[in-house]
Design a protein with these regions (language model features):
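Ubiquitin-like/PB1-type beta-grasp interaction modules and other compact soluble beta-rich domains
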Residues: 1-76
Length: 77
């Protein structure tokens, strides 16, 4: 399974990169992707995730060829 992972805004600094290309043999969830790609870093409070540009929960199953994006909550005024 091939997955593209992107980290936006401060999360790129938090994990030390803005994107990764991953290869896995087993089925994974969005949460699994975070844990494996960040070497087990704690999941930030209010983390937002998207799969193929649609908001997704951390327990959503990821498919081959998907793009998973992580980003902090959007704020503004």
């Amino acid at each position: 399974m091939s997955i593209k992972v992107r980290y936006f805004a401060s999360l790129g600094e938090h994990v030390g990169r803005t994107e990764s290309d991953l290869e896995f043999a087993q089925d994974l969830t969005v949460r699994d992707i975070w844990q494996l790609d960040t070497s087990g870093k704690p999941i930030p409070e209010n983390l937002l995730a998207a799969v193929n540009m649609e908001y997704a929960g951390l327990d959503v199953q990821v498919q081959d060829g998907d793009e998973v994006a992580f980003f902090p909550p959007v704020t503004g005024g």
